[in-house]
Design a protein with these regions (language model features):
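Adenosyl-5′-phosphate
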Residues: 97, 153-353
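Catalytic or ion-translocation cores adjacent to nucleophile or general acid/base/metal-coordination motifs
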Residues: 18-37
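A conserved donor-nucleotide-binding helix/loop in the catalytic core
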Residues: 78-95, 193, 204-208
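A phosphate-binding catalytic loop at a beta-strand-loop-alpha-helix junction
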Residues: 1-17
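Short, solvent-exposed loop/turn segments at secondary-structure junctions
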Residues: 2-4, 27-29, 53-56, 107-111, ...
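Active-site adenylate/phosphate-handling loop in enzymes that bind or generate adenylated species
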Residues: 87-161, 210, 215-225
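A conserved beta-strand->alpha-helix junction
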Residues: 32, 36-70
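Short secondary-structure boundary/capping segments
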Residues: 14, 38, 63-67, 113-130, ...
Length: 353
């Protein structure tokens, strides 16, 4: 990816020698292929932690994993398991040592504009006293976009009642900014503010708890205050699609790893799964795109997920569940909810409750 590559190539560019890299996921996954090639160019040691159905299912049954789920739950956001097995394995083989500092690229994509919807190219607004009559409609549009993107882990819960509850919480956050008394605020900046205040600070950064669990030191250089302040000032046309970010990385070409030969396109590692997925998609040729994606999430994602995140539940349970889970995080949210509240929303509550 761009962000972790920036970290690694930047360290090399500025003369850091005691650096080692690692990747994880399915064998021959496209990111690992690119990472191996980049690490070789940088002359940094690189290790791959293969995740397959056998080793991950075994790990999910261990006390280590169960304690991780229990002890990293904070009642604010769903527990993230992205690299919990990789760190476990790499520590076990002594590739990662106690004294090591783990550095990743969170959250360069968000900070540099990668999460601003492309439709903002034509719909951005400047909020100020002059257009205060449009304030409500603009805010409604911003919140609607934000809710659709980040609050649909379960299709069944994505209803008007719940969206109204979320809307009220988000509007309170916006009102705290007291926009009416400010000179100018870009509407896309509000969208980024909502994500920063919620998903980024509560969930994405919470993924660092994996390293805390293993007592590993860590750094997040792309959350540097000066870096954040710079990107807050960048105009929309240079943030959409990370335009400025990508152009500068390519122009600087730290350590020579920003040319086309180091870019690998997304592929599904298993040819068999690719063929089966293609066949099933062909059967949905007369179905809507929405219905196809719902089918894919329910029946296929279990087999294509690079980290086997859905394996925390039996396949039979996943395909029999009709609540339209978005991905593995949907299922993890049930774990977090049960730890925090004693039950999750899909379990039958007592009649007197």
């Amino acid at each position: 990816g761009l962000d972790s590559r920036l970290i690694a190539s930047g360290l090399k560019h500025f003369g850091y020698k005691k650096v080692k890299c690692f990747s994880y996921g399915k064998k021959n996954n496209f990111e690992a292929i690119a990472a191996k090639k980049i690490a070789k160019k940088l002359d940094y040691p690189w290790k791959f932690c293969e995740i397959n159905r056998v080793n991950i299912n075994k790990f999910y049954q261990t006390e280590t994993f169960k304690n991780f789920i229990k002890n990293t739950n904070d009642g604010v956001a769903t527990v993230g398991i992205q690299d919990v097995y990789a760190i476990y394995y790499l520590r076990k083989i002594n590739f990662i040592k106690k004294s090591d500092i783990i550095v990743n690229g969170n959250s360069g994509d968000f900070i540099s504009g990668g999460h601003i919807p492309i439709e903002y190219k034509k719909k951005t607004y400047l909020l100020n006293k002059k257009n205060s009559n449009k304030y409500e409609s603009i805010i409604n549009s911003i919140i609607k976009i934000h809710i659709k993107k980040h609050y649909s882990l379960w299709g069944k819960l994505y209803n008007n009642k719940n969206k109204k509850i979320i809307y009220n919480l988000l509007i309170n956050q916006i009102n705290e900014l007291n926009i009416h008394n400010t000179k100018n605020i870009n509407s896309h900046g509000l969208l980024e503010y909502l994500e920063f205040n919620n998903r980024q600070s509560k969930y994405v950064i919470n993924l660092q708890r994996t390293y805390d669990f293993y007592n590993q030191k860590w750094k997040l250089p792309l959350w540097d205050k000066d870096f954040m302040h710079f990107w807050a000032q960048v105009p929309l046309n240079l943030k959409l699609g990370q335009k400025l970010y990508k152009e500068v990385l390519k122009e600087l070409n730290f350590s020579g790893v920003w040319t086309k030969e180091y870019n690998v396109q997304y592929t599904i590692p298993s040819l068999r799964v690719t063929l089966i997925r293609g066949f099933l998609k062909a059967l949905h040729i007369f179905s809507s795109k929405e219905n196809w994606h719902k089918f894919e999430r329910r029946y296929i994602l279990y087999w294509t997920d690079n980290l086997y995140g859905l394996n925390i539940r039996p396949y039979k349970e996943i395909i029999s569940n009709k609540n339209d889970a978005r991905n593995s995080i949907s299922w993890l949210s049930l774990n977090s909810e049960k730890i925090t509240l004693g039950k999750h929303w899909q379990e039958q509550l007592p009649i007197n409750n």
